[in-house]
């Protein structure tokens, strides 16, 4: 309803101002939406913004579409405010009690490919990796909610130097898998041990180089070894990602773009670019004219391709199969991402959209896999789950242990996912154990608790007649907050900022708790009881849809 009403307001403003783009903002306490368009028009009309606002409002009052929607328009100084009427609130509530509220009709295009996580398979995922995963998965869920055809991909680096080192380690070192040790943790032990051997004997580097040459040439035995070790690590990743409720539709292997000739084809095109430079067989791009100081290497002096060339082949393939490509990358990939975008454009290809994120950290410090000092995502999940179980046990000691553990698993996942996604991607953050599991503050469990409270009220209430004739200020405030959910989904996918949904879910939980404090529900009677229970049903459904879009369980009891 907000989406349709907002579109109608924009159309009406465009008709009476002649402007194609009209900025609309939240109206705060006194309006549902507002615009500062009078300031923009003042420059061309040479009139005071206050006078322009009055003239625009006069024109809008005659707009039939806004009148039919029950939208009231008024000028407050240079600002134009829009207040939605009872018809809007009623329509929004009727939609909000339906399953799947906030979902947009399915679209045929654009077909979107979203790549996230894509961590090197040489050790367990750490906290930095899972911010990538959680941002990417939350975006994917929002895109699907918005009706877009979407494929979520993990790009598997099975040709990098790290994998060659792991393969050498398995060939030459005795490091069997420990009992109950995850595959990715085993891979990390071998990788760390192999690096130590290389530090002691630099001559091993030549053996690693040889492995890289063999895998590039397609040597069957070497390719088999690389894939075997990478697959084992991915099996470990799968457990971690499942525990975080993160899903991928496809795992795309880097080596496939060498095997099928795509990398060679991209390199051939790059050789013909005016920015190409050659030093023997070494091939690079000089992108200085675009502001890059370092050359963008495509092929080593030994004739083997580098990751960048294979990544270009991958993104060319994306363009052949999809209309829009989105990559989620860490801030440490800003240079690489910018070089990739620049080169794709030089090749006549559409550049991917990149969502960069700063890293999340823990007080424990370094996360360097090479040094063997990092906090794995598995350790984080285990610790948060333990703390969640203690909290649930304190709050609900009467529940049996199995139930408490199930609730703790959901609460822990909510704590981690929400604490990570609630921060705008471009901002760094420190994971706060206490805040992540705080049932009373800005946390995933706090929103889950509001949902569980709504479920409890509805269960105690039993049958009731749905009623949409709201009367009190708190009822209308809550209904209008519920009505904003579809527009938040639209904004998340437009701006690629999933934290906006996290913020909305918390605000909705807050608004519901305020409503519940001031407006008796179960103790009220007649039509008042029915309309408040209708609101509770709408809140419960909207919180459920919000939580599920954030990848968080909407549990019914806590």
Curated annotation (Swiss-Prot):
Claim: Lipoprotein is one of the keywords in the record: no
Major subcellular site: cytoplasm
Keywords: Aminoacyl-tRNA synthetase, ATP-binding, Cytoplasm, Ligase, Nucleotide-binding, Protein biosynthesis
GO BP annotation list: arginyl-tRNA aminoacylation
EC number of the protein: 6.1.1.19
One GO cellular component term: cytoplasm
GO molecular function, one term: arginine-tRNA ligase activity
Catalytic activity: tRNA(Arg) + L-arginine + ATP = L-arginyl-tRNA(Arg) + AMP + diphosphate
Family: Belongs to the class-I aminoacyl-tRNA synthetase family.
Protein name: Arginine--tRNA ligase
Organism: Methanoregula boonei (strain DSM 21154 / JCM 14090 / 6A8)
Gene: argS
